[in-house]
Amino acid sequence: MLKDLNITKSTIFYILAPSNKFTGGPTLLHQLGFSLKKNFNYTVRMFYYGVSIDNPIHQNYKKYNLPVAIKIEDNPNNILISGEISQHLNLCINLKNIQKIMWWLSVDFFYISQKKLLIKKNLARRFLNYLNKRIIKKISEKIYLKIERLFEIKDLSKMLDSFNFKCHLCQSYYAYEHLKKNKIKNVYMLSDYLDDSFFSNKKYLGLKRKNIILYNPKKGVEITKLIINKLSNYEFKKIENFTPEEIIHLMKTSKIYIDFGEHPGKDRIPREAAYLGACIITGKKGSASNNIDISIPSIYKFDDYRINFHRLESLIDSIFKNFSYHTKNFSGYRNKIRNE
C-alpha cells in the first residue's frame, strides 16, 4: 500500500467522518487516525461534515485526541482517507491534487448510498422539468449528465477511476473479493480492531452465564422477529440503549448472540460477543458468507432465506446445556480477533 503513496515529513493525513455521530463506521475512521498518529507518528487531521460542525467530535471519540481540520489542503503532498459512502465521495470529487485512498468499511452501504443519491437526482430532475424553464433545464441537464456519468454504476472500475484513488483498502475479505471481482486495481486488506475495553475486562471474571440470547434490533429485523416468534420459549434480549460497559457485562453473562443482518462489512458486535465468550449464530449474507471474516464452524451459520427452525432450536438447546463445549469451538475465531 505505502508504495502507492508519496509520504514525506510534511504530509498531512485527512480522514473524513460525519460530525458528532457514534456508529461503527466513524469508530473505525477514528481508530485509524489514532493508529496512524501513535504507531507511525504521522500528522493526522479529522475533517468532519454534517450538521453538528460547531461541536463535531462525539464524546466517545475525544479519547483519541485527534486534531480537527477546518479546511483540506488540496496538494499532492497530502493524503485523504475516504469511506465508501456517497457523502464522502461528494467531498472527494472536488479535490483534484491530494492523494486519495478509499477504505471500504462495507460493500452494501456503498451501493445503498449511491441509490439514494440517484433517487434525489431523479426527484430534482422531475421538479426542474415541472418548472418548464428552458435556461434551468439546460443547466440542470449538464449537471445531471455529469452526475449520471459519475454515479450510475454500470462499470464499477470506470466509476471509481473518475475519483483517481491511489489505492483501495478493505476492512473485510467480503469487500476485497468484491473489488477483485470487478477488476479494481491496487486493492489491499486493512482490518480494524476492537476497542481496548473489550480486552481489559478482568473485573468481569467469574460471572455466571444465563440462558439468554442477545440480538441487535437494527440488524436483520424481519428474520429476527420471525425467530423470536417461532422460539418464544427462550429469553431474547436486544442490545439497545446500553453504555459500552453495560454491553460488556451483558455479553459476559449471556450464552448466545444471533445476527441475521446484512453483514455489509466485518461487523463489530459479533466479534465483541464472540471475544467475550458468547457463542454466535449468524446467517450467510454479506461477510458472513465466507469463512474468513466470520471464521466460525459451519454448524453456527444458517441460510437466511430457508431457516431450519428445528435445527436452530436444537443448537440453542445444546449450547444452553453444554456451553463449555460449544464456547471452545470459537477459540480460533477469538484468537484471530485478538490479533487484529
Each model region followed by its residue ranges:
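Short, polar loop motifs at secondary-structure junctions
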Residues: Y49-S52, S82-L89, V107, Q171-E177, ...
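Short loop/helix-cap segments at secondary-structure boundaries that form the rim of catalytic
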Residues: D54-H58, E73-D74, H88-N97, S113, ...
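N-terminal pre-catalytic "stem/leader" segment of glycosyltransferase-like enzymes
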Residues: M1-I79, G83, H178, I281, ...
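Conserved catalytic-core segment of nucleotide-activated headgroup transferases in glycan assembly
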Residues: G25-L28, L145-I247
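Alpha-helix C-terminal capping/helix-to-coil transition sites in glycosyltransferase folds
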Residues: N75-N77, N164, K252-T253
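Donor nucleotide-activated moiety binding/catalytic core segment of transferases
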Residues: I70, E235-I294
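Extended catalytic core of nucleotide-activated donor transferases of GT-like folds
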Residues: L2, I53-L131, K142-L160
